[in-house]
Amino acid sequence: MLSQAILLWLFGSIHISSQFFLESPSNLSTIAGESITFRCSAEKSPEPIVYSQWKSNTGSLLGYHQEGILPGHQGRFSYIKQNAEELHLKITHVNLDDDGEYECQMLHPEEGPIRAKSFLNIIVPPQLVYFSNYQPNSIIAVKENTPLNITCVVPNVKPEPEVLWYMDGKVMSRDVKQASTPHLNKTFTVYTSLVVQSDRNDHGKVITCEAFQKETDIRITTNTTLDVLFPPSDPTVEILRNPSALRSGDNVTIACSVTGGNPPPDVFWYHENKRLQSHSTLDTRSKEIKNIYSFIASQNDNMAEYECRANNSRTGNPKRKAMKLEVNYPPASVELFGESNIRYGSSANIQCKSLPSNPASQITWIINGRSVPTPTQREFVVENGIVSSSNVSVHSNELSVEAHQINVECMATNPEGSSAKQHVIKIIAPPKAPIITGLEDRKFFEGDIVNVTCEAQGGNPLAELSWYRGSEKHLVKGRKKMKWSQVKKKLVMSLLCLCEVVIMNFFRFSKNVFYFFRFTLFIECGVNGAHNEVAGFSSYSTLALRVDRTMNTQRLKCEATNAALDEPLIESQYLSVYYPPRRVLIRPADSGDQRLLVGKSARLVCGTLSSNPAAHISWQFSRATDDNKVHLGDVSLNETTRDNGFNVENVLSFTPTEEYDGTVVHCIANHPEWKHSVNTSFPLNVMYPPKMLVNDPVTVVMSEGDSFKENLTVRGNPAISLWQWRKNGVPFDHTIGRVFARGAVLSGKQLLSTDAGVYTLTATNSVGSTNITIKLAVEYSARITSISTPVIAATGDTVLLECEADGEPSKANMIHWYKNGEILAAQHRGHKKAILRLNATEQQSGEYTCKADNGIGVPAEGQTFLLVNSAPRVLPVARYAKTAGILGGVAKARCKVYAVPTVEFVWEKDEQLIKKNSSKYSIVNTQIDYSTYESTLWIKNIVPDDYTKKVKCIARNSFGTDHLSIPIIPPTHPDEPFNLTMTNSTLNTISVAWEPRFDGGSDQIFEVKYRRQNDDLIHLVNTTHTNLRLSGLATANTYFFQIRSINARGFASSWTSPVIFATLNEDGVNVAMIRNEKLKLTTWIPYILIFIVLFMLLNVVICCFVCNRTKKRKLREKTEMARTAINGGDVRQVQMYGTMMGNDGMSRRDIDDRPEMSEDEHSVRTMIEVSPNGYMQPIEPMLYESTGLLEYDYQTRSYMGSSQGTRSMTYANVPYPEPPQPSYHSNWNSLQRQSNNNTSPQHHLSTFINPNMGVRAGPINYAQLDGDLV
């Protein structure tokens, strides 16, 4: 620490002295990213320099180090040192952070501390030049003579470069300004602006900004192009190929030229301020744009103005140049005005006017083919030309008139052409008086068509004929042309005629007002249908007239007129028309009250409007009881109408009843002179109070839970305005309980007993009201309302069990007591209570059921118990008979007991009391019902010794004791279920149930197998329950069912015997019962045949057996004789040892010459296995899970014995002589071990010991021990 402090003090007192440096560090400049080396060395000295180091640009000392990379600075700083007098600093990949002053410091032995400074300048060359507001190489649009300010930016450079401006390669120094902005990293951003005042000559020139850095000699540039906008020149217009004068029909071409403009201008022709369809062309050399438009000159182009417009975005308002055309054309036509008809001796003024022309037209006149001097002519200038006009007067008495007319012709002419037109003036004269034909018969029926002709002779022009009818003038239109004054007159007449029709309809009941209008309005109405024609010098008008009632007693008039008459010539005839009324009306006589009330006298009026002659009126009611009876009524009115017809009214009086409501009354108007009668109908609307269509009261009986809807059908007129419902006298609105009232409909949904009652409906209308009553009775099944609680009694006590029930209807003896399904005699108190009197005995103890049935729904049931004190009794439960568990596992033993009162359980093993809840045992007691109890013993950590002992369940109470011994066995197969029964069947389902047995020591499932009769397809279904419902079965089919149990260890019981169940047929009958009746006889036939065959075979077997036994007896006697002779008269003894399990079905002991079996043959506890060494050893198969014993090598032998062979025999492989071969071989392969999930019975094993031959296994037959000795 002290040496470091001294070193710092020495270096702190360093003074600058370059005379002692052999190589002093120099200033350096370099581009960022390159490497530099500061060199520093001192002069040689006898004593080496003790210390040397560098100080960085940040003022920090880099430290005393040997040659190599210095710590920090990203490994870019390093010392270079060849000897003690030098220390060079190398920096790689320099950056702006390295810019600054560096100092070399040394400690000289003679001079002391010395130092030398140098500077490192980092150069950043320009990388980018850009315009601040424009993209590089872009085009800048600027208006002519408008200043443009452009700024050029050079970012992040060091040192600042020189920025130059160029326009098309020429340096621009005027209006240039430059500024810079320093940054924290010691770089600069340089800004240079240029102001340009451009004109159209600068268009398209390139402006360049260049940045030049002298230190690096780097130049970078960016460019932009000027787009100078300026307007075009004024347009010039001309007519190409200009003729001396334009004429209508000439092809005219006009051109408009414009020079310059940026952007190029749009040049178009306009006429009447509408742009014309034309196109422009551009001359690239002269920059001239020309638009040419061609068209055919017409008279409309005379003095027309065509305008050329040039415009671009710089122009603002377009520049315009217009030209007017002068076109010569003839008059298209002339127009003549003046009178067409004059009387002889009068004069007419005619005016002739030409249509526009250029130049003006000259008018000339020709009358009846001769030219006349032209009067003074006038001229008018119009839009496209000049109109000429002239007047002339024509006197009929001064001219020669032919065919009653004068021909006047006018002609207009100019240098381009002429036009003429004629005018005819007629000389008029009056015709003769007209004549009417076709109305000789003056009586007609309405609707008839009458052809009438009017003729007028002579006249010029010929007469115009018109038809009129009535006191008013009804015009029948002709076909000749009418003047405007006549047209207006006709229109007014038509409008007034329409008014007449409206008034007639509106005032048909107000005669005085109608006649007022009749006599104050005089109307002429046109009627279509007249046909006019001319034949020779006469006019004819034919009218096809459809006669109607308005023509009755009216005059039909024909008028002849022409221009020569001031008043028309008239001829007329009168018409008489028969017609019925258009309609007949029925109305109540009292217009103030339109209602008809029941029992009140009523009057109806039937009226006919305008008939000729007067109508005869009769009445009819459309009721079945009237039989179309005709009523005449009373005539109350018979008057004349404006059409000279008759109005008739008839009154019918009657008293209406309810049956009249809706009845239609017919009024019939007829007359012998009419072609048909006219009638009308009137429905009677008879008002009466509401009336029920059902008998009162209405009784509705429903079952609880049902729904009903009762429509009471109330009739009344007018409609019922108020419905009021009450239940048991209490009003309610729409809903009460589950009953709903809507108008006359009373309905209920899922009724309850509380909905029963008397419902009253009051229906009211404006005439009166009525009531009706509905008695709603809700039937419900009987319900147990009270039942005695379970009773515990001693033997001999008298016990009363009471049961009360309610139901609708309540019936006598609807309550009964049952026990085990049998009815018991009881005392009844009324309909709702039954009392059962019992003498308490053990036989009477148990569950008692009270059933209440009133015939509605499902009978109600209630249970109670009579519990008679009794000693415990263990109930036989098949699945509790034994228990099983694996070594080290858990077994569960259960017993179920009946006892009254409460029972106490005790478990024992080997007469030793089992303690509760120890590590070996745990006990759980459960009460199932009032008299049934169950105790469960859990046995844990099973050992082989547990298999040799039983556990005992002891149940006791104050009245006695009972017990059950339960063996513990290894896991085995489950026992097959029993009592497989069908609980229900439908058309396509069968429900079955069964009872399980012992489960083999693990959880069991049940596998149900079924198949349809005459079908080989077998179905298997697994379930953990003791019942099953199968669906999707065929209707009316028989099925075979079997069931077995499979436990969790894979052991399975055998299948139960097949049981037949069946689905129902369409009638709901079980087909299995029907088929069993039919198959009873056919089922027994195969059994009878089998019995006969077996009986015959048995006789044959007995005969063979007797013969064979006789033969063997003789052979045995012969053998014994031989042995006696060889052995000195003694028979060799044979001793028997071992164990056999009896199987009556598989073996049978011989009757003769067999020694008696020892007691070991009856033991079922021990089996003897013969080892390969000949030793016998006991086997405990229950300790293992294997399903069989170890089998040694053996040879199959068959020994002759009884008729039955021995099953599954095993021989030990020992080196002893084999017994002799039998005289015959059995077909049984008795040595094949069968596997049936450990369900086959235990194999037989017998062991016999011969002193000379060793141990032999199998049944003995003395005849085979040594072979045949004879």
From Swiss-Prot:
Disruption phenotype: Animals are viable, fertile, egg-laying proficient and coordinated. Abnormal synaptic vesicle clustering in the HSNL motor neuron from larval stage L3 through to adulthood. Reduced accumulation of synaptic vesicle proteins snb-1 and cat-1 in HSNL motor neuron. Defective synapse specificity due to altered distribution of synapses. syg-1 is mis-localized and diffusely distributed on the axon of the HSNL neuron. The keyword Isomerase does not apply. Residues 20-1084 are extracellular. This is Synaptogenesis protein syg-2. It is found in: Cell membrane; Synapse. The keyword Disulfide bond applies. Expressed in vulval epithelial cells. The first five extracellular Ig-like domains are required for correct localization of syg-1. The cytoplasmic domain is necessary for syg-2 subcellular localization. GO terms for molecular function: cell adhesion molecule binding; protein homodimerization activity. It comes from Caenorhabditis elegans. Glycans are attached at residues 27, 149, 185, 223, 251, 311, 391. Interacts with syg-1. Residues 976-1066 form the Fibronectin type-III domain. The chain crosses the membrane at residues 1085-1105. The gene is syg-2. Residues 20-120, 126-221, 235-324, 331-426, 431-576, 581-685, 782-866, 872-965 form the Ig-like domain. Pfam families: C2-set_2 (PF08205), C2-set_3 (PF22705), fn3 (PF00041), I-set (PF07679), Ig_3 (PF13927), V-set (PF07686). Cell adhesion protein. Determines synapse formation. Required for correct localization of syg-1 at synaptic sites. CDD domains: FN3. It comes from the Eukaryota. It is a single-pass type I membrane protein. Changing residue 61 to A: Reduced syg-1 binding. Keywords: Cell adhesion, Cell membrane, Disulfide bond, Glycoprotein, Immunoglobulin domain, Membrane, Neurogenesis, Repeat, Signal, Synapse, Transmembrane, Transmembrane helix.
